Amino acid sequence: MDLQGKKVLVFGAGISGIGSCGLLEKEGAEVILYDGNDKKDAEAMKAQLGGGSKVRVVLGAFPEEEMESLDLVVMSPGVPTDLPVVLAMKEKGIPVWGEIELAYVCGKGDVLGITGTNGKTTTTSLLGEIMKNARDSVFVVGNIGTPYTNAAADTREDSVIVAELSSFQLESIHTFHPKVSAVLNITPDHLNRHHTMEAYIRAKMNIAKNQTPEDICVLNYEDEETRKMADEFQASVLFFSSKHKLEQGIYLDGEDIVYKPEKEKEGTVICKTGELQILGVHNYENVMAAVAMAAAYGVDLDVIRKSVLAFKGVEHRIEYVAEKNGVVYYNDSKGTNPDAAIKGIQAMNRPTILIGGGYDKQSDFHEWIQSFDGKVRYLVLIGATKEQIQREAAECGFHDCILKDTFEEALDTCVELARPGDAVLLSPACASWGMFPNYEVRGEEFKKYVNAL
């Protein structure tokens, strides 16, 4: 679609919506920024758009008579696609794109796209580092913090775009076509948005829906859901495995990470797990996925190896903060669902005071609680899910729960309970919304508190 002169509605005034407006204006579109919350500050939104912007801001109910004149609707990922106003626009035949689709249509270069329930940011960050060491024009975008729409206008034919993609972003793509994709794992998450596990999985699978046999999709052999996807995708599949020696793919053999792209040939040892600067089997899986994607794209294995060994990990992922009075503090604020938080507990090698709870995404916490396995001395709970988690903990035979009203009260309690030799771990198994704007702010508050002790 040529966007010059087209009337485009951007739905949602968050960071992605602002990025979409900027890109659309560069493309010559007439842009309306719409948010259903009529209590938002229209002037503040205009200020974010910049002084020269001609974007019109509409808050509250969208005028039905104006719908008829729209050529396109661009959804921000935080806005559900099944809202009545969105369904009404679809019924009128108005195309509805996500911001990823918009950026892809307007941008140039090859996309390497990563999705999955957990591990996306670590894998995207590592793949971004590898590509920056191998290519001149590299953009790391998407759910990782920089909207793809902010970068699209600067991309060139030889650019590589490394994109972290959430299920929200993938549910509204149409022509988006990565050269290399990856689905890292699938566990229940965001069911409050997608309603069913099947719908969540389908959204994730969209990452490969436009790929052809000339493209590559990297999948986790140890995850039942991702393994099944190999039969449905058109792309050539490359598996990674932490438990099986694969005939073809990338796998863990003792301490060796082995890349074996062809069945008939010997594999190449990329590195040993003991040489890595990040902890845990889940991180070895993230490394394997990034290595497989880079190698499939044609990056030299020596460049990959050097990049992997230099990689220090990602903020808010089992991040060492400090040792205070013999107690080690870890920030795993990115543990926003039970499966991710299990990885945090598994990485602990000390008795642990655990901070859990937050926004209710309709998760089940039994498996998370069962993973405590004698490591967790106390579970300090906050947020909307604290009573539910306490109930489920009791059902699992864990009774050392302490409920607090504020984050600071929870931290004070952890300091009181912790003994020399313990760890205090922020790995909440819940999203931060309701108490914090995002998991990054939650992690920063934790680090600020710890460093002030």
Regions found by a protein language model. Give the residues of each.
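N-terminal leader/targeting and accessory segments in enzymes
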Residues: 1-98, 102
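Nucleotide phosphate-binding/pyrophosphate-handling subdomain across enzymes
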Residues: 2-7, 17-27, 137, 273-376
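Residues at the starts of beta-strands that form the adenosine-phosphate
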Residues: 7, 29-30, 137, 179-180, ...
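Residues in the short beta-alpha loop(s) of Rossmann-like NAD(P)-binding domains
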Residues: 14, 37, 144, 222-223, ...
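Phosphate-binding loop of NTP-binding sites
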Residues: 22-26, 64-68, 77-221, 225-236, ...
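Short internal beta-strands
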Residues: 30-37, 217-221, 355-356, 375-384
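C-terminal helical cap/extension that packs against the catalytic core
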Residues: 43-54, 366-422
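Beta-strand->loop->alpha-helix junctions that form or flank phosphate-binding loops
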Residues: 60-61, 97-101, 234-252, 307-309, ...
